[in-house]
């Protein structure tokens, strides 16, 4: 389950594994993937102006630390039909670090 991780390590993971497709700040544009500002507490498939698959829209998943931690392990298993081309982060420590970073940076 989710435990507070190392946000600095999470930042490095974001930079190398996520930043090519996602932005974090309020008002920053969607890229290949949606802007992640306000991620926690938001329902999947609801970022304005982003073209989601039906699977993401229908999933109705509310993103919290625990649900996002699970999603990051294997996105295509968690939401079959997602177009996120990311194989997942297998190490729970890496996922905890990334979620800890995202929780701060997407507020």
From Swiss-Prot:
Membrane-traversing stretches: none
GO cellular component, one term: mitochondrial intermembrane space
Main location: mitochondrion
Post-translational modification: Binds 1 heme c group covalently per subunit.
Keyword Zinc tagged: no
Record keywords: Electron transport, Heme, Iron, Metal-binding, Methylation, Mitochondrion, Respiratory chain, Transport
Entry-linked Pfam families: Cytochrom_C (PF00034)
Disulfide pairings: none
Residues the record lists as binding heme c: 18, 21-22, 84
Molecular-function GO terms, alphabetical: electron transfer activity; heme binding; metal ion binding
Subcellular location as annotated: Mitochondrion intermembrane space
Family matches, as PANTHER family: CYTOCHROME C (PTHR11961)
Family listed: Belongs to the cytochrome c family.
Record's function text: Electron carrier protein. The oxidized form of the cytochrome c heme group can accept an electron from the heme group of the cytochrome c1 subunit of cytochrome reductase. Cytochrome c then transfers this electron to the cytochrome oxidase complex, the final protein carrier in the mitochondrial electron-transport chain.
Protein name as annotated: Cytochrome c
């Amino acid at each position: 389950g989710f435990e507070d991780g190392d946000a600095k390590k999470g930042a490095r993971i974001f930079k190398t594994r996520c930043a090519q497709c996602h932005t974090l700040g309020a008002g920053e544009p969607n890229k290949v993937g949606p802007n992640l500002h306000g991620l926690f507490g938001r329902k999947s498939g609801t970022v304005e102006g982003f073209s989601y698959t039906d699977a993401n829209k229908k999933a109705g998943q509310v993103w919290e630390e625990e649900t996002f931690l699970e999603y990051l392990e294997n996105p295509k298993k968690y939401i079959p039909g997602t177009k996120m081309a990311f194989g997942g982060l297998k190490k729970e420590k890496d996922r905890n670090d990334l979620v800890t970073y995202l929780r701060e940076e997407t507020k």
